[in-house]
């Protein structure tokens, strides 16, 4: 994936995160339990944070930074995506997918750290 495409993906995911945050605050607040709403908000928070991390990875550039961005993308899909589906459908087994997204996030941060060290030493 090119840096430009990765940057665009990060920006789109941030925009979707803002939209989902507004949806949760206005449309779901009266329909969900406090626990489910908190779970939805966690999904939005992690999506926003990692969308920004994707933007940073795209700006840093290099193969490792792009890999980090892809890991963040996978993390958003698995972590936030599974939580959104869990909250909206009530299908409990989706919670088993969430930790895989967390692992992708952790790996992404590690790879981004290596990419940053390499870029700053150059």
Regions found by a protein language model. Give the residues of each.
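Polytopic transmembrane helical bundles with strong interfacial aromatic enrichment
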Residues: 1-122
């Amino acid at each position: 994936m090119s840096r430009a495409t990765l940057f665009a993906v990060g920006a789109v995911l941030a925009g979707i995160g803002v939209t989902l945050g507004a949806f949760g605050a206005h449309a779901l607040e009266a329909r969900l339990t406090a626990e489910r709403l908190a779970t939805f908000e966690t999904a939005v928070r992690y999506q926003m944070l990692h969308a920004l991390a994707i933007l940073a990875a795209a700006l840093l550039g290099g193969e490792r930074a792009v890999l980090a961005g892809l890991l963040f993308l996978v993390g958003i899909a698995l972590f936030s995506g599974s939580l959104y589906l869990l909250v909206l459908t009530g299908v409990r087994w989706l919670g088993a997918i969430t930790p895989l997204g967390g692992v992708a996030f952790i790996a992404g941060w590690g790879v981004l750290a290596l990419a940053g060290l390499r870029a700053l030493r150059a």
